[in-house]
């Protein structure tokens, strides 16, 4: 019967089929190449969420300015009612022994954890978080904090972190005789 027994020439459509297959393979390779960074970020983000954050303590804490009674080391002493006293625009740098994946930063802003302690000094409502990797690359994140006592958890996703610098901006409650205060900064790495 005619429609079912057509004569087909040899190699009919083989070249077209081959070109289509090669085009599909090339498109898949290109998509894989261009989507690899997004896939890697998604993979790392998933690992961050599935793992339990573990606290990590810096080996050194240095500041651009500090008062004698309220040094920058008060931000990592584990006590939330002591603080680093400084002026607007000052920064504190935390250096770590080995590079790690920074997952979270918990900031206790102001002079302390309770509302009464919090209101005794000025506090920063904005901070610049600058991370330096072991290769020297710098990454920055702008942080906005609520003007209230307690902790503020900042979710980060920085790999290969060696140092962290916090710069205090946008002071609130800073009047005559008061300092800009930062009570505690806690760092968490991926487990």
Where are these regions (language model features)?
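Disordered, acidic Ser/Thr/Pro-rich linker "stalks" and the adjacent N-terminal cap
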Residues: 1-18, 29-97, 115-119, 188
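Trp- and acidic/polar-enriched beta-sheet ligand-binding modules for extracellular glycan
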Residues: 21, 113-191
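Intrinsically disordered, low-complexity terminal tails and linkers
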Residues: 23-29
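Beta-strand-enriched, solvent-exposed domains that form extended recognition/catalytic surfaces
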Residues: 79, 103-106, 138
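Extended extracellular/luminal ectodomain segments enriched in beta-structured repeat modules
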Residues: 89, 97-106, 161
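Exposed beta-strand and adjacent loop surfaces of beta-rich binding modules
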Residues: 91, 102, 124-128
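Beta-strand residues in well-ordered beta-sheet regions across diverse protein folds
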Residues: 95, 106-108, 167
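A short beta-strand element within beta-rich, extracytoplasmic domains
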Residues: 101-119
């Amino acid at each position: 019967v005619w429609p079912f027994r057509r004569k087909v020439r040899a190699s009919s459509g083989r070249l077209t089929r081959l070109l289509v297959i090669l085009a599909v393979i090339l498109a898949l390779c290109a998509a894989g190449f261009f989507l690899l960074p997004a896939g890697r970020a998604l993979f790392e983000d998933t690992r961050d969420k599935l793992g339990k954050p573990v606290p990590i303590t810096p080996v050194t804490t240095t500041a651009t300015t500090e008062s004698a009674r309220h040094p920058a080391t008060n931000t990592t002493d584990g006590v939330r009612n002591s603080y680093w006293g400084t002026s607007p625009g000052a920064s504190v740098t935390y250096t770590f022994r080995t590079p790690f994946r920074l997952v979270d930063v918990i900031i206790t802003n102001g002079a302390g954890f309770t509302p009464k302690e919090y209101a005794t000094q000025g506090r920063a409502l904005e901070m610049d978080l600058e991370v330096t990797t072991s290769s020297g690359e710098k990454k920055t994140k702008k942080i906005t904090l609520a003007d209230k006592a307690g902790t503020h958890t900042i979710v980060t996703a920085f790999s290969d972190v060696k140092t962290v610098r916090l710069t205090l901006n946008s002071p609130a409650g800073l009047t005559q005789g008061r300092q800009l205060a930062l009570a505690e900064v806690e760092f968490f790495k991926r487990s």
